[in-house]
């Protein structure tokens, strides 16, 4: 029975009928093009097909992929590995992709079923099995990730997490990177997934970005009909993803039988040629099978009928492709047997070796959470200020620092919502320009151009995801999330991707993105969605640096450190502090930096230590003055942490040992707030030095209200801070 290959491009429908594995040499294929109401006849160029050597290479990789799946199934049942998920049924389209794309030139965001593709790109059977046993020598993760999470820096196979759908946005950022690194390159980025993952909103954000920017990005969607147990008609409206994408401009769309190597090769050649010619992104929807269950944790017999499973078996490319090779005279059965024997022997030899491989060494668990080449907590980042000019507000210092760093580092780019001066460049002759809702990025687009400072769609996950892909290529994205209250759509990119990348890849990949976020209340009128804190959620993420300055000088030095360090940084900018007169500073110079993890003792004292940060620093200074006026023999020491992860334990310890009393104050909710961890550590490690219980002041355990009186009741005020300080001093 003939297989139908569909090609949608630019709103029209191109269709052709090809037999399974048919490849008439040098023939022309007639396509019928329907656009609007005017049908036209066009001819496509001669069909490009793999060579005999490529077809033999493809079969070898297909067979090896299936036998590796089978070997892992056996090893899992023997309790010699700990998880197994297969790519069975997907092999044909994957080997076709391996023939079309160029390892170490193109870039790859693979998913867990892409075993055959990874083999074609250069990952070996032994490397895959090292991942299966979780060996220290696993080149993808050093035993830190589940099997089938392939990564290889030399081959440009980027480390993937287990999260489905997050890869698309990173691939979009990666595809964008060539414009900065090598505009003449014809590189293409490939991102793959099953059809189920396209239900994630981040797929649609990535598709929108790819079409907006005409990125050289190829989406290979392998539709095996099921997302675990959910059939495609319950997953995708109409049951066909390609048809849903009709309205996306510049997008080439193709649908192909993904169990047919030759047809898949042709479709992918068209898609890749389109992207290499910089016409825009392409999507190939490959209909494949899944003859094995989702994973060894699943039993497909609980939701697939025998008839369904039998029909899938008939389309299994591992059975069909070798028969076609014989029928076409490409290989005889003896030649097939030689490949089978060689592959089986290679897998067995590799298995024997990896079962003797060492596990990750004890004591290595904390390695590679952060960069081992740039340490932002070191003395290297201690710099004396060289003040010039008039005193500036925090927002002005942040803006000037970004100007200086963009001048210094041509790989630094700034983007986010409303950060550009004006997306319509022609308007700049007549308008002042936006430059951020708080003006922190004003003038960056005008000074450095629209390629280096630009507006993004209103999509927080899209901002962080694209920044990840850009940073993975060596660029330095400094992105803005407009309000902390709206950061949550980006949470998967922040937690599952940005914070974990270096650790999960065993230092193979990194993404030193700086995420600038406006945070906090004390504004009057900000209410629930413009005044919240929640920094403790991000200090709980290993691999992420978290910074929160309280004044203009610190904002300058800490932002510069964030930009120059090699780790992802969450840079929290308190909105109330942007234009306060009391925290202004002269500019300290273009090389002024402040180390992370080094607190500032903003007021010395002998009787009580207060640990705080952000907008509460000034309120605590006011409270301390009141308490000292009422208690003339008392002095209070106030510590501004400045960075929340890491934090300066030594300064806290030294102060508490001196004062014997301590209070932690922050704007966020009291319960499970940032101060709880510090309080617990003080109680555990400094108990013998304490003359009073550890005190804490924070917001009420509710949301910030709109009415100013309500907001004042909810957030910590000077009187709350003073009252708790005096309570502790009475012990």
Which residues fall in each region the model found?
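A glycine-rich phosphate-binding loop feature that marks nucleotide/adenosyl-phosphate handling sites
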Residues: 285-292, 340-343, 364-374, 514-518, ...
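Flexible loop/turn segments at secondary-structure boundaries
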Residues: 116-118, 198-199, 226-229, 262-264, ...
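Peripheral docking tails and interdomain loops at the edges
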Residues: 323, 327, 675-731
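Thiamine diphosphate
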Residues: 8, 28-190, 212, 366-568, ...
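Short helix-capping segments at alpha-helix termini
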Residues: 505, 628-633, 685-690
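Intrinsically disordered, glycine-rich low-complexity segments
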Residues: 2-11
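Glycine-rich ThDP/TPP pyrophosphate-binding loop and its adjacent helix/strand module
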Residues: 156-348, 356, 539-660, 665
